[in-house]
Amino acid sequence: MAFEDQRTTVYKIDPAHPGSETLPTLRTEELLLNMGPQHPATHGVLKVILELEGERLVKSTPVLGYLHRGVEKLAEDGTYHQFIPHTDRLDYVCAMYNNFAYCRAVEKLMNITVPDRAEYLRTIVAEVQRIIGHQFWLGTQALDIGAMTVFFYCFRDREILMDWFDELCGARLTTSWYRIGGVERDFTSSLLGKLKQFLDYFPPKIDEYKVFLETNRIWVGRTKGVAIISAEDAVSFGLSGPTLRGSGVDYDLRKAQTYSAYPKCEFSVPLGKNGDTYDRYWIRVQELYESVKIIRQCLEQMQDGPIMADVPSVTLPPKQRVFTNLESMIQQFKLFSQGFDAPRGEIYCGTEAHKGELGFYIVSTGGGKPYRLKIRAPSFIHMGAFDHMSRGYMISDAVTIFGTYDIVMGECDR
């Protein structure tokens, strides 16, 4: 199917002068339509006021804040360790990334070096979470557009990794497995065996997803040429992740500001050409292959060693020592109840989550609690481009365009 920008009716565009727009000779009365608020079961409550001319979108105004819980303010009232479970409730579809990004920010503030084995464990779990996130997006986006079969296939394979998370940390969604200075627990032989088995099982399943969608004329027709954004506009709006790389911008924090075990792994960063919904789908599928490649390399390179930095004034003691040693029990109690004494200063640390750049900005005036914590959530940033990317498309494209960002309102509203 040839590439074609589907914005053609509301404003007539002169091909010779694409920057100029003229009104059509026949204009209908504009209509305001409320899309949402939706039920919380749809991963967040969102209202978008759509301004229509016929069936074409003239303007889209997102109304945010229905899921605002004051998460950033809560950070000021608890210790640094106590805030980790709160991060689970941001993007609750992929909580591991929230834990990871927050812990990296605190470690940067405290100048803590994480042990090598812990870095490999973190990277493996982060890439497993990326696979889960992209499977969730692919299944629900396909379902919204009309390809129901892919939804069942994606969630079938996602369940394998959700059960793996359950065995790893006792939770499927709100995980709280990452710790400041390391991780909560190591992999067991059972977890390693199941993960290796999944790495052999999964790549052929990705091929199945592609066959189902790329040979589906409805899917191709509803994604190619829809929600186009240029590289310049994508950068101007502050987009990141697959949404930015779909426009051909080569920017991935795992490469640009590399961290954890990523410098020791070889992987590619897929880039789109047209900046449309189809390119963003293609990038996410390619990232599934790359995540498998990264996990394999980490498993091959990982050596035995500690999983927590040895900084008694900041990091938690091993749980077995807490049960058998009085000093370790007191250390854990004090770290959770009083916190550690952070230096004065401010830092920002960004992490490449599956949606885009997830960053934490922390201002410390000393003491055991942050003075201010600000979260840079990719979902919130991407919602700012919704009006720009939806103008001129059909009302039936609104759900497709909203889904192309992979937005979770818990992260957006906070």
Model-derived features: positions:
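Metal/cofactor-centered catalytic core regions of large enzymes
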Residues: M1-R414
